[in-house]
Curated annotation (Swiss-Prot):
It comes from Methylococcus capsulatus (strain ATCC 33009 / NCIMB 11132 / Bath). Its main location: cytoplasm. Nucleotidase that shows phosphatase activity on nucleoside 5'-monophosphates. This is 5'-nucleotidase SurE. Belongs to the SurE nucleotidase family. It catalyses: a ribonucleoside 5'-phosphate + H2O = a ribonucleoside + phosphate. A divalent metal cation binds at D8, D9, S39, N91.
């Protein structure tokens, strides 16, 4: 098996190194990752300029683009052989609920799915994570499970791991995405020249975080595994929308 690894924290991030070290005894590993931190890049592709891919001192391939760029290049011609699946992570921080819309880590996995490969995004749920060995062990266990029972090519698994020692984990939970309240206000300040600047505010607090959600699983010291889909259509509203639209509507 040939596994492509990427992330959004950059090619030198401890989480990516931990993931590569954990999976390399089990499969052929190729790492293609951003040359710098691109957290929050979501599914953006770089279209206004060419991209450069270079071999870093640690042997990883670094790209001067987004996580989506990295996976796209890797699968569509950068590599000599196409990988069989994509692992993205280990992200430095949770990707729970609404976070998946912004996450470059989840986007890297999503791009793998767009290009026909099963993909796993794995995140360590803490602001300053420490227990990368726990998330690495989870990645090993999931890979072993995938080998026993392969994932369909249209599968994206969003995995969040509590930042605790491995022996404190309380198992795995199949979860749905929770939700957050509205994000906090931007932080308004001034640069050294007195010009107004803004920092994006913090994510909103939990809104939908009850049993069955990814938030709840993490609070219970369980690994949260959420299956994601690409189709964002809200099917139960199609008929209502058709009745609401002005003029003649055709299906």
């Amino acid at each position: 098996m040939h596994i492509l690894l990427s992330n959004d924290d950059g090619y030198a991030a401890p989480g990516l190194r931990a993931l590569a070290a954990a999976l390399s005894p089990l499969a052929k590993i190729t790492v293609v990752a951003p040359e710098r931190n691109r957290s929050g890049a979501s599914n953006s592709l770089t279209l206004e300029r060419p991209l450069r891919a270079t071999r870093a001192e640690n042997g990883f391939i670094r790209v001067d683009g987004t996580p989506t760029d990295c996976v796209h290049l890797a699968i569509t011609g950068l590599l000599d052989s196409e990988p069989d699946m994509v692992f993205a992570g280990i992200n430095h921080g949770a990707n729970l609920g609404d976070d998946v819309i912004y996450s470059g880590t989840v986007a890297a996995a999503t791009e793998g799915r767009f290009l026909g490969l099963p993909a796993v995004a794995i995140s360590l749920a803490a602001h300053n994570p420490e227990h990368f060995e726990t998330a690495a062990q989870v990645a090993i266990e999931l890979l072993e499970r995938i080998r026993e029972n392969p994932l369909p090519a249209d599968t994206i698994l969003n995995v969040n791991v509590p930042d605790i020692p491995p022996d404190e984990l309380r198992g795995y939970r199949a979860t749905r995405l929770g939700a957050r309240h509205k994000a906090e206000a931007v932080v308004r300040t001034r640069d050294p020249r007195g010009r107004e600047i803004f920092w994006v505010g913090c994510a909103g607090p939990e809104a939908d975080a009850g049993p069955g959600t990814d938030f709840h699983a993490i609070r219970q010291n369980c690994v949260s595994v959420t299956p994601l889909q690409i189709d964002l259509t809200r099917y139960e509203r199609l008929d209502q929308l058709g009745a609401w639209l002005p003029g003649r509507v055709t299906a």
